[in-house]
């Protein structure tokens, strides 16, 4: 089954790549006034560079420009601090390894190829992780396959191929969830800690994934009788979590040193400086006078940067001019709100029926999906009231497997049994329409969810 899932995932990525290639060549590219990675005039484009730009150029738009800029120049502009480092830094180091081989490509082309190739590989791996996680929790091959199928053609599928961190985060979070959900009851702390650190370094919402090791470790202590090695396990789990948080704070310290300490003066290339002047961006190395967040008691830049540069905040996006973006996000948000509410309603009835210590343990043992649905419900609520509403589809599609489990419940055993005038049919139309339209629009630099 692993081979079958891998073939499905790879085929879906090749379809997206083909649609992007055709759309990028057939339609005129939109040129919005947004961030574009500044490129040195010293880079001479060879014919291979032009072929790569022609074939993959549609996969670098919007946030992809930021990730590729960080991969090449690190955090030279303050607005790039909205993007966490794991994905672009991995792309950077793999790109440097490829460049060391002596391939005659520009750095811009190498980074784009590496970014897309990395997402291809991680997508196939994450599809298999989703299949395995679903099988561990539900022991249902049909549901596991349908979940993987929907994942491969999810409504935000273009963002899992483009130079975005969605695929890396999906891979990291699914790996963490699978490690926490292992039925053996013994945690592999090194793997768990690595996956947790990857989640924290990949996306800001990775912080919520801390709840998984905490919940499943507490669940194990509750359901099992006290064992002689409980203290050792508690120590190991504590060190694992603190280690992952410590790695995240190493990144925070690096950013603080880069932007707030007066003795840090990066030697920026001239084209980076020129673009900063043109766009009125704050360059790193300005010292504590450069930005207000340097004076905060806890000088974490993320919230400030999101608020200052993107106007992200509680209900700030609720404006009439954003109605099209609300409509784009409506299918995902309404789907998730309803199914999470329905799950919690049934859970509340089960809790009410078993208000005893033994009944509580039974609930914890039987409702293994509770932390996943709670996580999904929190993310859905945050998307609804806080973030730019149009990112809800890709955020939820990459951050939680719950969407795929709920969707898989509506799917028939085979696609031959699929009827368009049914819930499964509506789901099929939604996923295929968003996949196709999203790929066409995104690859030509038009706004998309």
UniProtKB/Swiss-Prot annotation:
What GO molecular functions are on record for this protein? alpha-1,6-mannosyltransferase activity; glycolipid mannosyltransferase activity; mannosyltransferase activity
**Enzyme class name:** transferase
Named in its record, the pathway it takes part in is: Glycolipid biosynthesis; glycosylphosphatidylinositol-anchor biosynthesis
Instruction: Name the source's superkingdom.
Output: Eukaryota
The record describes the protein's role as: Mannosyltransferase involved in glycosylphosphatidylinositol-anchor biosynthesis. Transfers the second mannose to the glycosylphosphatidylinositol during GPI precursor assembly. Required for the GPI-mediated endoplasmic reticulum exit and proper targeting to the cell surface of chp. Required for GPI-mediated membrane attachment of chp, qsm and Cont. Essential for microvillar stability in the rhabdomere.
Q: What is this protein called?
A: GPI mannosyltransferase 2
List all topological domains (Lumenal). Answer: 29-82, 131-148, 218-235, 390-423
Instruction: Using the UniProt annotation, give the residues that carry a glycan (glycosylation sites).
Output: 44, 142
Localization annotation: Endoplasmic reticulum membrane
Predominant subcellular localization, coarse grouping: endoplasmic reticulum
What is the recorded phenotype of mutating residue 306 to A? Answer: Mild photoreceptor cell and microvillar disorganization
Q: Which GO biological process annotations does it have?
A: GPI anchor biosynthetic process; rhabdomere membrane biogenesis
**Mind telling me which residue stretches traverse the membrane in this protein?**
8-28, 83-103, 110-130, 149-169, 197-217, 236-256, 369-389, 424-444
Per the similarity annotation, which family is this?
Belongs to the PIGV family.
Q: Name one GO cellular component term.
A: mannosyltransferase complex
**Deletion consequences:** Homozygous lethal.
Record's keyword terms, sorted: Endoplasmic reticulum, Glycoprotein, Glycosyltransferase, GPI-anchor biosynthesis, Membrane, Transferase, Transmembrane, Transmembrane helix
Q: What is the effect of changing residue 276 to V?
A: Displays defects in chp trafficking to the membrane and mislocalization of ninaE, Rh3 and Rh4 in photoreceptors. Shows reduced levels of chp and ninaE, small rhabdomeres with severely disorganized microvilli and retinal degeneration
């Amino acid at each position: 089954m692993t081979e079958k899932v891998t073939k499905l995932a790879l085929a879906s990525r090749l379809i997206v790549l083909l649609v992007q290639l055709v759309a990028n060549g057939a339609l005129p590219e939109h040129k919005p006034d947004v961030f574009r990675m500044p490129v040195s005039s010293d880079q001479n484009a060879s014919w291979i560079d032009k072929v790569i730009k022609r074939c993959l150029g549609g996969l670098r738009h919007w946030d992809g420009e930021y990730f590729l800029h960080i991969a090449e120049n690190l955090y030279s502009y303050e607005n790039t601090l909205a993007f966490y480092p794991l994905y672009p830094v991995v792309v950077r180091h793999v790109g440097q390894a490829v460049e060391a081989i002596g391939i005659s490509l520009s750095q811009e082309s190498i980074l784009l190829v590496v970014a897309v190739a990395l997402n291809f590989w991680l997508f196939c791996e994450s599809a298999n992780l989703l299949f395995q996680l679903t099988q561990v929790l539900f022991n249902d091959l049909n549901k596991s396959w349908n979940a993987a199928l929907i994942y491969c053609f999810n409504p935000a599928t273009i963002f899992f191929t483009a130079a975005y961190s969605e695929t890396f985060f999906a891979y990291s979070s699914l790996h963490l969830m699978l490690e926490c959900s292992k039925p053996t009851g013994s945690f592999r702390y090194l793997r768990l800690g690595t996956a947790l650190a990857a989640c924290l370094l990949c996306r800001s919402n990775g912080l919520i994934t801390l709840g998984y090791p905490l919940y499943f470790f507490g669940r194990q202590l509750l359901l099992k009788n006290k064992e002689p090695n409980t203290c050792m396990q508690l120590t190991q789990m504590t060190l694992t979590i603190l280690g992952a948080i410590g790695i995240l704070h190493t990144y925070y310290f690096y950013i603080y040193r880069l932007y707030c300490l007066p003795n840090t003066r990066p030697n920026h290339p001239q084209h980076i400086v020129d673009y900063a002047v043109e766009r009125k961006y704050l360059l790193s190395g300005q010292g504590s006078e450069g930005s207000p967040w340097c004076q905060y008691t806890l000088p974490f830049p993320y919230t400030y940067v999101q608020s200052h540069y993107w106007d992200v905040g509680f209900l700030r996006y609720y404006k009439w001019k954003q109605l099209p973006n609300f409509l784009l996000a409506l299918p995902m948000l309404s789907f998730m709100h309803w199914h999470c509410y329905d799950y919690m309603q049934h859970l509340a009835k089960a809790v009410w029926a078993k208000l005893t210590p033994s009944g509580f343990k039974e609930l914890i043992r039987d409702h293994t999906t509770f932390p996943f649905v709670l996580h999904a419900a929190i993310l859905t609520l945050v998307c609804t009231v806080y973030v730019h509403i149009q990112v809800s589809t890709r955020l939820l599609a990459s951050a939680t497997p719950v969407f795929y489990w709920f969707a898989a419940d509506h799917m028939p055993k085979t696609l031959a049994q699929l009827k368009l005038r049914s819930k499964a049919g509506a789901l099929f139309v939604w996923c295929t329409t968003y996949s196709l339209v999203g790929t066409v629009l995104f690859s030509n630099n038009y706004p998309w969810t």
